[in-house]
Amino acid sequence: MSRTTNWNPVTYARDARFVADLGKPLLELLAPKKGEVVMDLGCGDGALTEKIAQGVSVIGADTSFAQARAAQERGLPIVVVDGHHLCFKRRFDAVFTNAAIHWMQRPEKIVQEVWLSLKTAGRFIGEFGAKGNVETVRSALHKGLRRRGIDPLALDPWYFPTAEDFSKLLIKANFTVRSIEIIERPTQLPGGLLDWLEIFAQPFTNAIEKNQRRSFLNEVCERSETALRDANERWTLDYVRLRFAAVKLEE
């Protein structure tokens, strides 16, 4: 069974544009300076990368060929690369990442690769899911799989740490943590929960027979609606984010 997600730039832009829109405050934390070279790690379709590129030299990095192509169509330089194996050495003044680290299975390796990619005193600026992120839906997904005799822990793709746990990873990799905070950010979806699940819950649904997947997703929606859907049938997910800024120490 696979934890792979097949990213579709069209449906992502339609149903998940809020991911980039809500990442805009992170650009202020990045505060890029003229002449800097920045990597956007997990750049997706390049919506935020494009904004960074207005002031500095930027390279987007993503594992998805489809998303990389969408970013390239914006005129951005993109590399298709696994964040666990970046293969850059002291190249960047800053590494920026939004809503990507929680998809990466070995966060300690990611942090090490970012450290190697940065120049001395380079900045690592990011935001991703924290402990408790989308907990209602995650719990419903797990329950639905267990009911079908499938171990959800073998499929769950998400890494949602506490601030303390992620701070320890940064310090161990020889970063100085300038700031780290947990932000509770209830997020209203542009469409229904089903649209969100079809994008983000693929590692769970891939374990279900194709002719049973819609039934499984409907069950997840039913388990979640009391907590997440209001009287006007608008869905608001219990997003919790971890936002951080760290600096690479002297080598």
How would you label these PLM feature ranges?
Residues 1-36, 47-51, 67, 125-148:
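Conserved class I S-adenosyl-L-methionine
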Residues 94-107:
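A short SAM/SAH-binding and catalytic strip from SAM-dependent methyltransferases
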